[in-house]
UniProtKB/Swiss-Prot annotation:
It comes from Yersinia enterocolitica serotype O:8 / biotype 1B (strain NCTC 13174 / 8081). HAMAP family: Ribosomal_bL25. This is Large ribosomal subunit protein bL25. Pfam families: Ribosomal_L25p. Keywords: Ribonucleoprotein, Ribosomal protein, RNA-binding, rRNA-binding. GO terms for molecular function: 5S rRNA binding; structural constituent of ribosome. GO terms for biological process: translation. Belongs to the bacterial ribosomal protein bL25 family. This is one of the proteins that binds to the 5S RNA in the ribosome where it forms part of the central protuberance.
């Protein structure tokens, strides 16, 4: 089981996302289930390394730890930079 530490995002929009990426982080979102969608931020290098592990894209899911609360999710969509090896956004769906 892969566990990723995430933080809740307070600022949203293009400028806030660009500031995150400049700080070696990137935006993501968790949706689905009965709870409301949560905008989060992830550390780029940690997530990029975990992405290479088997099981990151499996339907068995990942565990996101947000403010000490564990949420079981699976990857729904990944957006990448056009020519750099960078993740720009990930959509997670609750399972």
């Amino acid at each position: 089981m892969i566990t990723i530490k995430a933080e809740v995002r307070n600022d949203q929009g293009k400028g806030a996302s660009r500031r995150l990426r400049a700080a070696n982080k990137f935006p993501a979102i968790i949706y689905g289930g009965s709870e409301a969608a949560i905008a989060i931020e992830l550390d780029h290098d940690t997530t990029k390394n975990l992405e290479l592990k088997p099981g990151f894209y499996d339907n068995t899911g990942l565990t996101l730890v947000i403010n000490g609360k564990e949420t079981k999710v699976k990857v729904q969509a990944v957006q990448r930079h056009a020519f750099k090896p960078k993740l720009t956004h990930i959509d997670f769906v609750r399972i």
